[in-house]
Each structure stands twice: as C-alpha cells, then as structure tokens.
Amino acid sequence: MPSSMSVRLFTASAAQRKKIQEGDCCVVLAGKTQGRFILIGAVARVSGYIPSYLDKDELCVVCGDKATGYHYRCITCEGCKGFFRRTIQKNLHPSYSCKYEGKCVIDKVTRNQCQECRFKKCKTVGMATDLVLDDSKRLAKRKLIEENREKRRKDEIQKSIVQRPEPTQEEWELIQVVTEAHVATNAQGSHWKQKRKFLPEDIGQAPIVNAPEGGKVDLEAFSQFTKIITPAITRVVDFAKKLPMFCELPCEDQIILLKGCCMEIMSLRAAVRYDPESETLTLNGEMAVTRGQLKNGGLGVVSDAIFDLGVSLSSFSLDDTEVALLQAVLLMSSDRPGLSSVERIEKCQEGFLLAFEHYINYRKHNIAHFWPKLLMKVTDLRMIGACHASRFLHMKVECPTELFPPLFLEVFED
C-alpha cells in the first residue's frame, strides 16, 4: 500500500452507504463489514448543503476543494473556514512555522501539512481576520439570532391572530343577547367575593350516611346545599328562556335540553368562581365551600372534577361573554336523547360556536391554542354531567327522598 495512503474505519448511514456503493464518493473500497467501510485514501464525501449563489462546481480559493459558501469575505470550503476561524479565535498563528521557507503550495492534499503557509494563503486571498468573532461576540451574535428568531415567531403568531376573523354584526347581536341573559341570571355578578359566606368548617366533616363507591354523605352539609340548589336551577332555566332560539323550540325539547345541561351549567358557574387563596368554590354566588365539604355533602367524586375544572379555568381569565357562550353551547347540545328538533338545535349550536370562536379571536388571549383548549372544557363539563347523573341514582338509594327539593328531583330524575 502506498505510504501516502491511509486506512480508516468509517461508520456510514444508510444514505451514505448507498452513495459509497454507487461510486458517488472519491474512495477506494477494500471491503466492508456490518455497515462499516474500510476506506483507503480519502474519506467518503457526502454532498452537503450548497448555497444557491454558488456555482455547482465552485472551488475553495485557498485549497481548491469544493466550496461550501462565502466565509470571511471569501468563497471557501468548510475545512479552510474552520482552520481560519480556529487560528484567529485561539491566536495560534504565532506558533505556526514552515519548514520550507514559506513556499509551500497549498491544495486539498497538502493543506494540512503546513499551517503557516495555509494561514498565509487565507490572508492573501482576502479572508478577513476582523470578521472572526471572539467568544463573547460569538455568544452575543448567537443570542441576537435567537432573539430575532423568537421575534419572527411572535410576529407570525400575531399575524395569524390578526388574520383570524372577528364577529360579524349579526354575531355581535347574538353575543349581546347571550351575554345579557347570563348577566341577568348570574347571582351576585362580579361582587360574589364580597358577598359570599363560607360554610362553617365543622359542616361537611362528619359523614353519617354511607354512600356507594366509598363516598360519605354529611347530612348537615347536604341540607345546606339543598337550600341553594333550587334557586341555582331556577337561574339556569331563566338563562335559557332569555334566548329566543331556545324559546322557539318545542316544549318537549326545551325540557330535555334543560334536564341535560342543568348540572353542567351550574358546575361551570361554580368553577369560574374558584378562589385559589381559600381553595374554595362559591355556589350560586353565595356559599363558599371546600373540596371536602362538597364531596361529603353528597357529590362525592364529582366534586373533584368540578374543583379541578375550577383550578384549570382560573388561568383562562374568562369574561362574562365567554362564560355565557360556553353555557349556550352546553344548552344547545343536539345529542341529548329524545330530541325531535335535532337539526335545528345543531344549527343553533353551530351558530353559537362560530360566534364564540370569532369572539375569542377578538379578545386575543395570550394563551397558546386558547380556543381548542377552551372547547375541551365543554367535554369536561359533559363528563361532570354524566358522572352526576350516576351519582344521583346512588344518592336516591342512600338518602331519604324528603331531603331532595322537588325541583331538584324534577330536573335530575329520568
């Protein structure tokens, strides 16, 4: 084997092996074993990215190898670019010396044999030392690049937000009707924190009646909750009756929709009044309860779902209109069993959803993917409604019927 040749092992990717096997590299193959190639001579070359401003076969002005771009004011290969950068950054050139009086010919074969002549040629062809950044400048440049990249990303997000449609005049009118219906039927309004009363700590801590699934029912807490359940249900009914599209439906469908959504809307109204400081929910705008009190007072595992929803929604900063539109979407659910006007109800819900989405665009929340995340809360509320229906059946077995308010039974009994 000629002394000028070298033998090395080269681990290649599938794409690189294909290139080698097809003779697309300047190598001589002596053999291969398990994807590792014994290369005699030059190392396998795999075509990399070449900028569009370079000719296909443009050569490095320093060594004559294939050029990869415009580096430090000259068209060079990656090898000469890296050599020049390292030399300047580490101040290596004072230690370079030539054995042949600085007269070496630099090409892609000899470029690694004499560092002094290679560096000398780099400067001769015009490579600029002042363009090589030291560590601090390089970090500053990298930071600037990252900042510009982040700015472009934010600009793209902002541009996409700006381009999203906002409510039409007709949708604004619908939004106003729904919002006014909610505000008129939402107990205590925005003053609920000032007007709420905390359920005494000793209530809801003494389970008396065993409930299924390991739950307990504190009858005193249950009695307190029954005092506010009737007005809470009444407010949900009043909300629905203030929507013209609901009132135009057959009475039978109105009843089915109300029975289906009542717990969901009451849960939503409680969840948006979650207070992180006291870790309580305020029911019907007046009674603040802890997770344990709500659980022991009859709701069992359903209370966990409502509290978890409250914790999640606290970061959304929903306004009255968004809460109102969520309620309208829950009310007009066309998949409730027994409905006769399915297509009509579905069309109403689609109208609410479209106006809702456009209102979200108008509000311009700073939460990524706000709209789909908010829609997931509709699914969570539907699950709460389904869990409560199951829980109600167990409660009817465990608790005396006279403890349940008549309207409560009317709404939640099948």
UniProtKB/Swiss-Prot annotation:
<dbReference type="GO" id="GO:0048384">
    <property type="term" value="P:retinoic acid receptor signaling pathway"/>
</dbReference>
<dbReference type="InterPro" id="IPR035500">
    <property type="entry name" value="NHR-like_dom_sf"/>
</dbReference>
<dbReference type="Pfam" id="PF00105">
    <property type="entry name" value="zf-C4"/>
</dbReference>
<dbReference type="GO" id="GO:0030154">
    <property type="term" value="P:cell differentiation"/>
</dbReference>
<dbReference type="GO" id="GO:0045944">
    <property type="term" value="P:positive regulation of transcription by RNA polymerase II"/>
</dbReference>
<protein>
    <recommendedName>
        <fullName>Thyroid hormone receptor beta-B</fullName>
    </recommendedName>
</protein>
<keyword id="KW-0863">Zinc-finger</keyword>
<dbReference type="GO" id="GO:0000978">
    <property type="term" value="F:RNA polymerase II cis-regulatory region sequence-specific DNA binding"/>
</dbReference>
<keyword id="KW-0675">Receptor</keyword>
<dbReference type="GO" id="GO:0000122">
    <property type="term" value="P:negative regulation of transcription by RNA polymerase II"/>
</dbReference>
<dbReference type="GO" id="GO:0090575">
    <property type="term" value="C:RNA polymerase II transcription regulator complex"/>
</dbReference>
<keyword id="KW-0539">Nucleus</keyword>
<comment type="function">
    <text>High affinity receptor for triiodothyronine (T3).</text>
</comment>
<dbReference type="InterPro" id="IPR001723">
    <property type="entry name" value="Nuclear_hrmn_rcpt"/>
</dbReference>
<feature type="zinc finger region" description="NR C4-type">
    <location>
        <begin position="60"/>
        <end position="80"/>
    </location>
</feature>
<dbReference type="InterPro" id="IPR001628">
    <property type="entry name" value="Znf_hrmn_rcpt"/>
</dbReference>
<dbReference type="Pfam" id="PF00104">
    <property type="entry name" value="Hormone_recep"/>
</dbReference>
<feature type="DNA-binding region" description="Nuclear receptor">
    <location>
        <begin position="60"/>
        <end position="134"/>
    </location>
</feature>
<keyword id="KW-0805">Transcription regulation</keyword>
<keyword id="KW-0804">Transcription</keyword>
<comment type="similarity">
    <text>Belongs to the nuclear hormone receptor family. NR1 subfamily.</text>
</comment>
<feature type="zinc finger region" description="NR C4-type">
    <location>
        <begin position="98"/>
        <end position="122"/>
    </location>
</feature>
<dbReference type="GO" id="GO:0002154">
    <property type="term" value="P:thyroid hormone receptor signaling pathway"/>
</dbReference>
<dbReference type="GO" id="GO:0008270">
    <property type="term" value="F:zinc ion binding"/>
</dbReference>
<feature type="region of interest" description="Modulating">
    <location>
        <begin position="1"/>
        <end position="59"/>
    </location>
</feature>
<keyword id="KW-0238">DNA-binding</keyword>
<dbReference type="InterPro" id="IPR013088">
    <property type="entry name" value="Znf_NHR/GATA"/>
</dbReference>
<dbReference type="GO" id="GO:0005634">
    <property type="term" value="C:nucleus"/>
</dbReference>
<keyword id="KW-0479">Metal-binding</keyword>
<feature type="domain" description="NR LBD">
    <location>
        <begin position="170"/>
        <end position="414"/>
    </location>
</feature>
<dbReference type="InterPro" id="IPR001728">
    <property type="entry name" value="ThyrH_rcpt"/>
</dbReference>
<dbReference type="GO" id="GO:0004879">
    <property type="term" value="F:nuclear receptor activity"/>
</dbReference>
<keyword id="KW-0862">Zinc</keyword>
<dbReference type="InterPro" id="IPR050234">
    <property type="entry name" value="Nuclear_hormone_rcpt_NR1"/>
</dbReference>
<dbReference type="InterPro" id="IPR000536">
    <property type="entry name" value="Nucl_hrmn_rcpt_lig-bd"/>
</dbReference>
